[in-house]
Amino acid sequence: MALRLDGKVLARDVEHRLQTLIERCLAEAGRPPGLAVLRVGDDPASAVYVANKEKACARIGVASFGDHLPGDTPPALVLQTIERLNANPEVDGILLQLPLPAGLDEGPLLMAIDPEKDADGLHTLNLGRLLKGEPGPRSCTPAGVMAMLRSNGIDPAGKRAVVIGRSILVGQPMALMLQAANATVTIAHSRTADLAAHTREADILVVAAGRPEFIGAEHVRPGAAVVDVGIHRKPEGGLCGDVRAAEVESIAAALSPVPGGVGPMTVTMLLVNTVVAWCRRHNLDHDLDDLVP
């Protein structure tokens, strides 16, 4: 039976560390950290995600600023909202909830966010910082995956890692983080020929394919660590990931569950980016390695 890569347990630990830091530094800063989440439209999944983020903020003492715009909001008005949040001195982190409604191009809107307040780590400047190994906000889901690997004693150094998916949200930054940790990395995608031939070579397999239960036992090398980034609602009810967990858990050495794996750590890394930005703005003593073990 595979080791369970439990994101909930790790998320609680990191949240406790963040809460302790906030309580210690609150008087010196004069205000709590602030996270603004901008949601456009009425996508039900996005509404759930935003509610979860607001609850996480409340648990650790981060002020939450929510903006919800109608789905037919023109791009200029969304841009004005971002600029207002950029100028708000009580906001340390800004998240533009994706996906956006049709007609809104996420690229220019993400670029409009102040890079120092980019809580999701998706601004071009911060992706460049990641590429160069410089400090800055990190993409939340890949950063959460790296924390899960570390906390379970899985060192990517010298290992073969395969990332399925090449999105700027997960796949590309995930590959960069694994490479920075001295793994030999392959990115696979929808046009990859003979996918299983690549994935069966992986010591670490990160699946962000966006396809329900796409990866099965035939794709997994015995003893591999498998991280399932996907989350989907089944027609008959319940949730599943991109991995057929019942097949893979008997082969893999480690497997992240869905739900309860990557999802909680994605939210927690959003809080980490926000709190670290708050510390930097107020010159507060902090150590990222102490916050995320």
Swiss-Prot record:
One Pfam short name: THF_DHG_CYH
InterPro entries given in the database record: Aminoacid_DH-like_N_sf, NAD(P)-bd_dom_sf, THF_DH/CycHdrlase, THF_DH/CycHdrlase_cat_dom, THF_DH/CycHdrlase_CS, THF_DH/CycHdrlase_NAD-bd_dom
Catalytic reactions of this protein: (6R)-5,10-methylene-5,6,7,8-tetrahydrofolate + NADP(+) = (6R)-5,10-methenyltetrahydrofolate + NADPH; (6R)-5,10-methenyltetrahydrofolate + H2O = (6R)-10-formyltetrahydrofolate + H(+)
MF term (GO), any: methenyltetrahydrofolate cyclohydrolase activity
Pathway: One-carbon metabolism; tetrahydrofolate interconversion
Binding site for NADP(+): G165, R166, S167, S190, I231
One cellular-component annotation, GO: cytosol
Keywords noted in UniProt: Amino-acid biosynthesis, Histidine biosynthesis, Hydrolase, Methionine biosynthesis, Multifunctional enzyme, NADP, One-carbon metabolism, Oxidoreductase, Purine biosynthesis
EC number in record: 1.5.1.5, 3.5.4.9
GO BP, one annotated term: tetrahydrofolate interconversion
Function as written in the Swiss-Prot or TrEMBL entry: Catalyzes the oxidation of 5,10-methylenetetrahydrofolate to 5,10-methenyltetrahydrofolate and then the hydrolysis of 5,10-methenyltetrahydrofolate to 10-formyltetrahydrofolate.
Complex formation: Homodimer.
The family this protein is said to belong to: Belongs to the tetrahydrofolate dehydrogenase/cyclohydrolase family.
Name of this chain's protein: Bifunctional protein FolD
Organism: Synechococcus sp. (strain CC9605)
Species classification: Bacteria, Bacillati, Cyanobacteriota, Cyanophyceae, Synechococcales
